[in-house]
Amino acid sequence: MIKAIDTIVAQATAPGRGGVGIIRISGPDVEAVAKVILGKVPKLRFAEYLSFSDQHNEVLDQGIALFFKAPNSFTGEDVLELQGHGGPVVMDMLIKAILSIKNLRGANPGEFSERAFMNDKLDLAQAEGIADLIEATSEQAAKSALHSLQGEFSEKIEQLVESLIYLRIYVEASIDFPEEEVDFLSDGKISKGLYQIIDNLEAVKKQAKQGAILRDGMKVVIAGRPNAGKSSLLNSLVGVERAIVTDIAGTTRDVMREHIHIDGMPLHIIDTAGLREGADEIEKIGIERAWQEITTADRILFMLDATTTSAEDPRQIWPDFIDKLPKSVGLTVVRNKADLTGEAFSMTENHDHPVYRISAKTGQGVDLLKEHLKDIMGYQGHTTSGFMARRRHLEAIDNAQRHLLEGKVQLEEYKAGELLAEELRLTQQYLSEITGAFSSDDLLGKIFSSFCIGK
């Protein structure tokens, strides 16, 4: 347990008027605060209805007091919670009275959670789960954040780390005892253990990607030539008319963004200017911005006017566009105006690209497209949600995976035990960054400073 010098105080409930306002105090001088504000130290883990007074015994409010003794508290320190009336003036008066006591100061953003982390009450991924639960914008995201808070993500990472430690011991034993008759590097046990870790890490990576989408949303860019129906599709997905729609090519000249949820799954839908040569200066700027969005998208909805072509292969339709796309960006072909061509509103696969036939104007086939977007995001319906993940988690997993695969090369091609051991060590180091078992002070400061004050 890390011993704190300061005792900190902050309002734990949101600022503003409310029926109840909660003030949280944590640190070594909590009992001194209780004696001043309450006139006594409350009974441990027992709700007492008391008056809240200042140092001059003037009553400021009355409510419930809860006292938790270290280490049995959220922060692992002595903690006092005062639950009073939620008016901003009352809260401010009470906090000022508490701050007038020696060794008290206002808490920094996320400092209560940081102290909980430092005192091993929760790991870094769980601490981030608190912030993600508070900031969740959908039911699915809230459930996933709760699973992270409850340690589901951390447990998977710890299982991987334990497997790595066991494998490292075996590899390093083969290095330290070369005189043994058994060739540890060739007996199959190391390769079997390594392949199992590679498979398990890939499974966790897939879940983490879904968790990151739940937290940050999936960026879907609608792109195509002018007058293909891009703005009509945006309006249909959003459910209201956000974009101006006309028969004039080039009506959309700038990027338009809308944030929507499809069954709790967050999407950032981006409508872009029609891509063409020979546009005027204003439209050219819009096209440049469109390409900026396209290259950073998670998914491209490639819009076609079905009345102008029967082709479905995007490379056949517009090879230059496909060549400019980053390989990491997924593509879905959308044949719009199928109501005019008589095509069935359906989906087929063509050269690894799904093709959807819709009418953005009438909305026919759009529900099928929505189901497609949900599937891409890993929608799980009413089944148990996965865990929440952040971009730093994905980066750590990517780095760990890179070193793990390099270790596989060292084992299979070179039988280099020392280099394999080093790659396993680096893999473990990156995975341990996720839970905070191995993290720099700069990283911790950046993470906790993004939390709410009082958390």
Swiss-Prot record:
Its main location: cytoplasm. It is an enzyme of class 3 (hydrolase). Pfam families: MMR_HSR1, MnmE_helical, TrmE_N. One of its GO terms (biological process) is tRNA methylation. One of its GO terms (cellular component) is cytosol. It comes from the Bacteria. GTP binds at residues 227-232, 246-252, 271-274, 336-339. InterPro entries: G_TrmE, GTP-bd, GTP-bd_TrmE_N, GTPase_MnmE, MnmE_dom2, MnmE_helical, P-loop_NTPase, Small_GTP-bd. (6S)-5-formyl-5,6,7,8-tetrahydrofolate binds at R24, E81, K121, K455. It is found in: Cytoplasm. PROSITE patterns: G_TRME (PS51709). Residues 217-378 form the TrmE-type G domain. Keywords: Cytoplasm, GTP-binding, Hydrolase, Magnesium, Metal-binding, Nucleotide-binding, Potassium, tRNA processing. Its cofactor is K(+). Its EC number is 3.6.-.-. K(+) binds at N227, T246, I248, T251. Binds 1 potassium ion per subunit. One of its GO terms (molecular function) is metal ion binding. PANTHER family: TRNA MODIFICATION GTPASE GTPBP3, TRNA MODIFICATION GTPASE GTPBP3, MITOCHONDRIAL. Belongs to the TRAFAC class TrmE-Era-EngA-EngB-Septin-like GTPase superfamily. TrmE GTPase family. This is tRNA modification GTPase MnmE. It comes from Psychromonas ingrahamii (strain DSM 17664 / CCUG 51855 / 37). The lineage of its organism: Bacteria, Pseudomonadati, Pseudomonadota, Gammaproteobacteria, Alteromonadales.
